[in-house]
Amino acid sequence: MIKVENVDVWGFEHAIRGMRNPMNSWDKSDSKFDVQTYWDEENTLEAEHYDAIIGMSDLDLMRRLYKAGTEHRKYLRQISVSMDITAPLYWWKEFDTYKVGTTSNSCSTMHKIAEKEFELDDFSYEQLSGNSVSVLNDLIDWLNFERREYRRTKSKAYWWQMIQLLPSSYNQKRTITMNYENVANIIHQRKCHKLDEWVEFCQELEKLPYVSEIMYEG
């Protein structure tokens, strides 16, 4: 299970301006910025809630620089995105390999593990068979026993039982900030991954403003 919410994207204006610095081609820029809604000449809604409406001249240059490689597409690293992601610990373990250009703030398992009772929906279990779900439910019951004893006695020994018994299917929420270069790398490296969470996450990334238009030429 993976859930992506509270997505925010910014930085198109300065990224495109900087993209045109090497050739002093600012006069060729045809994008519109800070637009909530934009209507064409036939009164048809073209875009809504975008930080920018990228013109075809700018988009063409963005595509060519993207194809030219990381040393030429520095503008991608100037477009930022933040989002809240809820995903199992086994997925976060792999996400944590993306260190450069990413910042993460997580809900604390260490501090908040005993705050509420454990429930089945706190875990990713959609691929488990019936017998395996029963095993997980038994584990949840035991975790809740350790939780009650910890809250009753304040003994750290019970806290340790929860920490070391907690399975990697436990879902954790984090707020992530990264840039479009990170986005492109993740899509390229993970869109056909064995884990469903990676496939679904890449699909969410492809929905970000202009990601597909840049990477796949529309």
Task: Tell me what each language-model feature is.
Residues 1-218:
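Family-specific signature for flavin-dependent thymidylate synthase
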